[in-house]
């Protein structure tokens, strides 16, 4: 009688370079075919929800940046919208346009990282180099408005921290750059931030084309992604998939279109939808989403150029007065002191607010008991639902395809483990 091969179990991660952080998976293999994939989470658990209950509403805001640390400002946006809904704060129109613009900048940042690292994991190294070149310019936008390249804390309940600056920081001369290269780098930085954004929007679609040239019709890329990790529309909805993971399966659901928030109902853009629900279709959706984000950014930039105005609410129970006023007026000083020591008091109630995060539907559920701190803060992370589909998506595929499936899910453990 022939000896039957026993299934064997291996650990994937948490030190694996394609684990996207601290993913540990126990894989049961029959030869090189996956029989079972069991993700183990919690290695990046930092107790964000509990920590937020011990901080004022403003102090809890920077924790949002650290959830999905590739899409910082969209996390902030969900939190701010939830607080504003509970408190009944009216956000100035200009602030809403700035938020929408930076949410789309963040979407491009996320997709460049997602596609670049996905290709890199599979073995196409060039894509990530091109992706990081463009991400660098968008990181400069973050730095120009907030002073930080990653954890911006730029969105605030009631608006944004400050208006767009009138200039962009320039590259300085160094022994690594000659005068010609320096001039080339600073060419788009001569004017205002909006000039820089417009120049980026003109240039970026060509850079997306370059990425597409590297990957879209690449025979090896298609062999590694077509027909891999297929999810039917029915299973995608049953599993709670959102964002590209749902649209890649052919379900046209985008919170920006179906339940518009901020200024998205005024924007003209399309929703890319996949057909086959595999890794390749999800890649194509992300590519097209970047093009649509450029369209939205252009519309915001046009409006912001001709419509000056306040960028944060004038209700000083929720947002501080300007520093110049605070230093000259007693009432303004009191408001400032109360806000930054005691914090804002949000009326009793509860709300769930969802935004179209680059990875899916990012939701924030807040219960307020009328105090200066949230009574309960629950975060609905899109990646958490996607990771639960790992077993179903990987079953029957080869060991090497696990890497492609993790990449297509675009998992970041800051939000999964919270």
Curated annotation (Swiss-Prot):
Keywords: Cell inner membrane, Cell membrane, Membrane, NAD, Quinone, Translocase, Transport, Ubiquinone. It is a peripheral membrane protein. The gene is nuoD. The lineage of its organism: Bacteria, Pseudomonadati, Pseudomonadota, Betaproteobacteria, Neisseriales. This is NADH-quinone oxidoreductase subunit D. It holds the Pfam family Complex1_49kDa. Transmembrane segments: none annotated. Belongs to the complex I 49 kDa subunit family. GO terms for molecular function: NAD binding; NADH:ubiquinone reductase (non-electrogenic) activity; quinone binding.
